[in-house]
């Protein structure tokens, strides 16, 4: 949780030999983060990212696109946000794995994406409607211009 990280903690991390931190910020769009039940916002992640950079700690960010409520606009906002952090590496995942008995599995059943009887032993990934065709090409385009971005 970002609010638990401050400059004093980062100083201790550096003293302990920390060289890299993975930031699972998932989205740069606050409504999408709220929909994923994340307890932080993009500005908190930006604050921590800057502190880490100030102390020479490399940062890898994880961007998760296509969840419930995701739109073209929120995807664009997240990509721009991720780019603005100037991270050493960004890992983009499109679609969210559906696990049994979760809020996402209930949404996927309601939307007809999976059946209520699906045991989900074979991985299934939720992708918001309307993004199926557009999202992979958009991510590919962004990654083509950013060699430190992977999927």
Regions found by a protein language model. Give the residues of each.
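A structural motif corresponding to the C-terminal lobe/cap of the Radical SAM core domain
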Residues: 1-151
């Amino acid at each position: 949780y970002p609010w638990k990280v401050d400059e004093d903690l980062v100083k201790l991390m550096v003293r302990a030999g920390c060289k890299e931190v993975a930031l699972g910020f998932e989205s740069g769009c606050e409504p999408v983060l709220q929909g994923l039940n994340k307890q932080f916002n993009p500005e908190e992640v930006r604050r921590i990212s800057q502190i880490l950079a100030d102390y020479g700690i490399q940062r890898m960010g994880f961007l998760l696109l296509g969840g419930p409520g995701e739109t073209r606009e929120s995807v664009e906002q997240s990509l721009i946000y991720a780019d603005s952090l100037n991270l050493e590496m960004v890992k983009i995942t499109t679609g969210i794995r559906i696990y049994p008995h979760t809020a996402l599995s209930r949404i996927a059943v309601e939307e007809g994406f999976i059946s209520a009887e699906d045991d989900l032993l074979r991985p299934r990934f939720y992708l918001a409607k309307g993004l199926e065709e557009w999202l992979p090409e958009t991510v590919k385009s962004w990654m083509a211009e950013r060699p430190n971005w992977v999927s």
